[in-house]
Amino acid sequence: MAVARYSETAERLMTPKPGIRKPGSDVVKSPFRNYLAYARGFLTQERILRGREFIERNAAVFDEIEMTSGVSRYVITAVIGVETFYGRNMGRYRVLDSLMTLSFDYTRRAAFFKEELAHFLEFCWRQEVQPVTVLGSFAGAIGYGQFMPSSLDRWGADGDKDGRIDMVESEPDAIASVARFLTAHGWVAGRGLLYP
């Protein structure tokens, strides 16, 4: 793996941040905002507009996916919208560099990332993709749905039926993969949704 480079960013961003402790208290509070404040950042007019465009652009794919899996186009679109703003922010880090760094230089979760690295390399080999060309998150997540390589391996789907699974360039593949992931994790068609 002589082509892989150490990624200081991956190691730094994976390192847990210290919590905030009130004086005299044993309770450690997360330095992050509460969920509702966090979620409001996703409910912008632009994100809603882009979501509608994503649904319209992929209407035929969604028709088929809803019929075969029962997963709602709105739920799939919401997942992709939160994860990558409909493909706008899929990551700018070489996945190979991130996974190599987190496998061998970040001992806290090395076993997990070694498994992810193995899945990534196997996936690239099967799909005939050069590992150094794949970009993703600092932690190695890939494509519209930000799947880790093991998830891509298990639940990646060929939505455009071209014989390949491409979560970066193919919206149909991303849509089918998110639906497959949700179905595998207990999605029940017609059941209501809960939200805070």
Regions found by a protein language model. Give the residues of each.
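Cell-wall glycan-active module
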Residues: M1-K114, H119-L135, G140, S150-P196
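Functionally critical loop-and-helix segments that line ligand-binding/catalytic clefts
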Residues: Q146
